[in-house]
Amino acid sequence: MSFTCADCGTKACEQRNYDKMPDDSVCISKNTDQQWFKDLYDEEDLKIAHNAAVTEAAGYCRQTRLEETMAFAYRMGYRKLGIGFCTGLSKEASVLARVLRDNGFEVEAACCKCGSIPKEFVGITREEQLHPERDFEIMCNPAGQAEYLTSRGCELCIILGLCVGHDTLFIRHYKVPVTVLSGKDRVMAHNPIGALYQADSYLSRVHTFIKDTFG
C-alpha cells in the first residue's frame, strides 16, 4: 500500500513545517517544486483562488455553504448563475432559485431529465430499468444540462443532487466554473460524508463493499 496525503495526519504542510513532513519520497510538499504548483494558475485561476480564500475567511464557521456560494459568486462578479439539479430535488431547486433571485442573481436551471431521452439510448434494457414494469424510463442527461446552461450564458453553475457518474459527465461538459451545493445520497439525506462518520460502526460494510457486491 502506497502512502498518500490521506494517510498523513501531521498537517505539516499547513504550517510549512518541513521538519514534520514525511519522507521526501512520499510527501508532495517536499518532492514537488513549489514553482511547478504556482505555474498551474493562470490569471482567472488566481482570481478564483483569491476570492475563494476571502470567502472562506469572511464566513468561517458562520456562513452556510449556500451563503458562501452566493458570497463567492458576488465577489467574482458572477451575476448569472445556473442550477443543474436532479428531479428528485425539484423542491430544493425551486427554493435555491428563489434564494438566489432574492439576492439579485439571474438564474437559469436545467433538470436531469431534460430532453426526455429514453434510457435505451445508453444501452439500458427494460430488465435493467429502475421500474422494469414500465415501457420506458427517461435517462438523466447531464451533458445536455451542462451544454444548455453554458449556452444560456451562465457564469457559474451550481450542482444540486446529481447522481454519481452523472455529476462526472456534467463537470466534463460544463465550459465555465462549477461548484457543488450538494451531492446525491438517497440513503443519507443527501449528506454523503455521513457514511464516513459511520464507516467504523453502523456502516462498517463499506470496507468490504466491492468484494461483497461484485465478488
Could you describe each region identified by the protein language model?
Residues 59-63, 85-93, 115-116, 160-168:
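Gly/Ser/Thr-rich loops at beta-strand to alpha-helix junctions
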Residues 179-215:
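C-terminal functional extensions of proteins
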Residues 106-113, 169, 173-191:
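Short, acidic/small-residue loops that bind anionic groups at enzyme active sites
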Residues 78-87, 109-113, 156-160:
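Short glycine-rich or small-residue beta-strand-to-loop segments that form or flank ligand, phosphate
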